[in-house]
Amino acid sequence: MPNAIVAAEQYREIFLNQHPIMDVRAPIEFTRGAFPNSTNLPLMLDSEREKVGTCYKQSGQQAAIALGHSLVNGPIKQQRIEAWASYVKANPNAYLYCFRGGLRSQLTQQWLKEACVEVPYIQGGYKALRQYLIGVIEAAPTQQPLLSLSGMTGCGKTDFLLQRKEAVDLEGIANHRGSSFGKNIDPQPTQINFENQLAIALLQHQTSDAACLLLEDESFLIGRSALPQTFYNAMQAANVLVLEESDDARLERLRNEYVHKMYSGFCERLGAEAGFAAFSDYLLQSLVSIRKRLGGKQHQELQDLMQQALDQQINQNDTSLHLVWINLLLHKYYDPMYLYQLEKKSERVLFKGSHQAMHEWLDSYQTR
């Protein structure tokens, strides 16, 4: 059989090879934070875990263990063993863990062994793996030169990053496009899951032959996902590349992202009528979120233009009026804010250019 315990030296390999992991923590623990390659098959359900925890506080470890055995017994125990065995059969290279790699891991492994199923458990459990990934994030800015990709809203930074092996897509990991209108249809990950996925992406990046780590110039918050402080501080000190694009191209890109993609996504999810209502709410509420910064008069003007565009879209299947409010939003809000921020980091700008020019500059950076 394989080694019964997976040691800390193998943590990196677990994530790089996306080993399937059977997570036997309670569902509430899994929901708070987990790894992309893990599946929750709990030893105890939330209610059972709560009872055992109360017993432990009141009567000690042995009484809590005895209660746990009485709660997970007979048909319930057999059902859980069968679920674990099915998972291991489908994933023969799987590992298992609980929170600390303690009693729950050992008991699960023992019960499976009695059912003639062998599966190693991970030393230190979820907690140790999580600490390992936090260390990966903190160390990443010291592993390679860090470059920050900046550019006006709508210039196509994400499109550009997705074409580069040097890049890690922070907005993709956060499932948010970073701007006031950056919310997607599916929810953002929990903060813990955002950090876990960021660390794994950084690990994968380190296996490439990229000469630098290229990241989009982000705020501390991407939607509600907060960048780890040490990592964010390093980004703030990084040299900057500025991606340039024409105003017309920016407008078309933003109409496609804010209007066409979001409308199609909502309709696909909810149907035509409910989808349009949800899409309209997304646009109007995104505008409300920056009302204080716009000022009441500017917000009202944009809201009126947005409503006219929505009316034209639903009545005439024409999205051209959306270009009017997007253009005003760019020139009255996004562009002045961007230029102010860029001025503060002007001394760190290494290069400015179009998509093609930026590709050529980075290609030459690889060979320096």
UniProtKB/Swiss-Prot annotation:
Any one GO biological process: tRNA wobble uridine modification
Top EC category: transferase
Active site per the UniProt annotation: 98 (s-selanylcysteine intermediate)
Residues covered by the Rhodanese domain: 15-138
PROSITE patterns cross-referenced by the UniProt entry: RHODANESE_3
Catalytic activity: 5-methylaminomethyl-2-thiouridine(34) in tRNA + selenophosphate + (2E)-geranyl diphosphate + H2O + H(+) = 5-methylaminomethyl-2-selenouridine(34) in tRNA + (2E)-thiogeraniol + phosphate + diphosphate; 5-methylaminomethyl-2-thiouridine(34) in tRNA + (2E)-geranyl diphosphate = 5-methylaminomethyl-S-(2E)-geranyl-thiouridine(34) in tRNA + diphosphate; 5-methylaminomethyl-S-(2E)-geranyl-thiouridine(34) in tRNA + selenophosphate + H(+) = 5-methylaminomethyl-2-(Se-phospho)selenouridine(34) in tRNA + (2E)-thiogeraniol; 5-methylaminomethyl-2-(Se-phospho)selenouridine(34) in tRNA + H2O = 5-methylaminomethyl-2-selenouridine(34) in tRNA + phosphate
Keywords tagged on the record: Selenium, Transferase
GO MF, any single term: tRNA 2-selenouridine synthase activity
This enzyme's EC code(s): 2.9.1.3
InterPro entries associated with the record: Rhodanese-like_dom, Rhodanese-like_dom_sf, SelU
Family to which the UniProt record says this protein belongs: Belongs to the SelU family.
NCBIfam families linked to this entry: PRK11784.1-2, PRK11784.1-3, tRNA_sel_U_synt
Assembly behavior: Monomer.
Biological function: Involved in the post-transcriptional modification of the uridine at the wobble position (U34) of tRNA(Lys), tRNA(Glu) and tRNA(Gln). Catalyzes the conversion of 2-thiouridine (S2U-RNA) to 2-selenouridine (Se2U-RNA). Acts in a two-step process involving geranylation of 2-thiouridine (S2U) to S-geranyl-2-thiouridine (geS2U) and subsequent selenation of the latter derivative to 2-selenouridine (Se2U) in the tRNA chain.
Name of the molecule in the record: tRNA 2-selenouridine synthase
Source taxonomy: Bacteria, Pseudomonadati, Pseudomonadota, Gammaproteobacteria, Alteromonadales
